[in-house]
């Protein structure tokens, strides 16, 4: 059955398929497949690569919509393959669940968070960020100051996913960790996406990759504007008895503030991500949650770029990659993943492309304007 399952996935378009037992994933909460399916005995990891040429145009700030469309299509393709694999397992008499790729965090199901419905959060944030006159703007400000603490209640900034597709991919032998914490494939580097099918079928595990394709170049850390990826501090992860090393990541809000688009420039001047936002993040992680609370309360009620990003972030988190329309998929960073091609030569070229790509400024109606090239997207 395992080979039939793999053939099915590859016939549907998967570039690689791997299998791991649930026992291999004992350890951290995000590795536990029983959260998704009680009685889980195996996981099936699916992989698709991203197009390197599209990524380079994105890194060079030549094409922004192209990457957004491409990444959305690849995620949806992965999920479609996962659903077909799950249907095959169910036809064989087993239970199976295809886990949504990314943005599927456990806090969304928490009682405190669900006291305010998704639809209400979205409508309220869209209204708060809309243009309004002086009187209505003052009312919005008062509402945010009073009700923001309640609306944020229940969010766990640890961002534990329903199931970690990265850990699943490593357990199933599809790749190994790079310094960034992204999973690297020998042929594609980090420009790969994963989905996972969890099942109570007992399937034979594939071998875990013994070595990592990462050679320690640290280009991922060099292109991290937020300081989320440490240059030297490291941590260990053990999967299936094999211990791997990657950087000791900083607080998740560092990544959110840059990768979600609130700020395109923090540590490194002269170039930016695709975000025109400019925020200086606190140096110490212990200050960053207070910084976020103050930032949110100060900007949520304004008709500005930051409030627009907040609205988009709520939309993305609630609807995920699968359900949201493509025009709401606003990638601004991902540089730590996209810089990491297969060879060091390619990574160096990607790094230089980023440095030469210039900065993004805010154009009319919150559109992006690329400085140096003069292009507006």
Language model: regions and residue ranges:
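Catalytic cores of enzyme domains
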Residues: 74-336, 342, 352-357
């Amino acid at each position: 059955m395992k080979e039939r399952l793999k053939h099915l996935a590859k016939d549907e378009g998967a570039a690689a398929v791997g299998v791991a037992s649930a026992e291999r994933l004992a350890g951290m909460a995000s590795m536990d497949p029983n959260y998704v399916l009680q009685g889980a005995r195996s996981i099936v990891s699916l992989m698709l690569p991203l197009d390197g040429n599209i990524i380079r145009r994105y890194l060079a700030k030549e094409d922004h919509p192209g990457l957004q469309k491409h990444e959305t299509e690849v995620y949806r393709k992965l999920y479609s393959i996962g659903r077909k694999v799950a249907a095959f397992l169910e036809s064989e008499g087993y239970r199976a669940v295809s886990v949504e790729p990314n943005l599927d965090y456990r806090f969304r199901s928490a009682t405190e968070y669900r006291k305010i419905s998704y639809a209400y959060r979205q409508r309220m944030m869209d209204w708060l960020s809309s243009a309004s006159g002086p009187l209505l703007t003052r009312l919005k400000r008062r509402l945010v100051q009073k009700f923001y603490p309640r609306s944020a209640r229940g969010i766990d900034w640890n961002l534990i996913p329903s199931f970690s597709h990265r850990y699943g991919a490593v357990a199933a032998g599809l790749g190994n960790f790079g310094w960034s914490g992204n999973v690297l494939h020998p042929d594609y580097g980090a420009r790969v996406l994963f989905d996972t099918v969890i099942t109570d079928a007992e399937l034979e595990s594939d071998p875990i990759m013994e070595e990592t394709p990462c050679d320690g170049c640290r280009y991922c850390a060099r292109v991290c504007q937020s300081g989320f990826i440490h240059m030297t501090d490291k941590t260990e992860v053990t999967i299936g008895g094999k211990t791997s090393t990657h950087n000791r990541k900083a607080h998740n809000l560092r990544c959110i503030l840059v990768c979600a688009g609130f700020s395109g420039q923090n540590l490194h001047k002269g170039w930016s991500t695709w975000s025109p936002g400019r925020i200086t993040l606190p140096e110490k992680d212990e200050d960053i949650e207070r910084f976020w609370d103050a930032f949110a309360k100060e900007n949520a009620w304004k008709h500005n770029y930051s409030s627009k990003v907040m609205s988009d972030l709520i939309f993305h988190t609630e609807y995920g990659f699968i359900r949201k329309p493509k025009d709401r998929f606003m990638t601004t960073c991902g540089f730590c993943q996209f810089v990491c091609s297969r060879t060091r030569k390619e990574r160096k070229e990607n790094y230089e492309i980023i440095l030469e790509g210039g900065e993004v400024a805010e154009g009319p109606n919150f559109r992006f304007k690329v400085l140096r090239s003069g292009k507006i997207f």
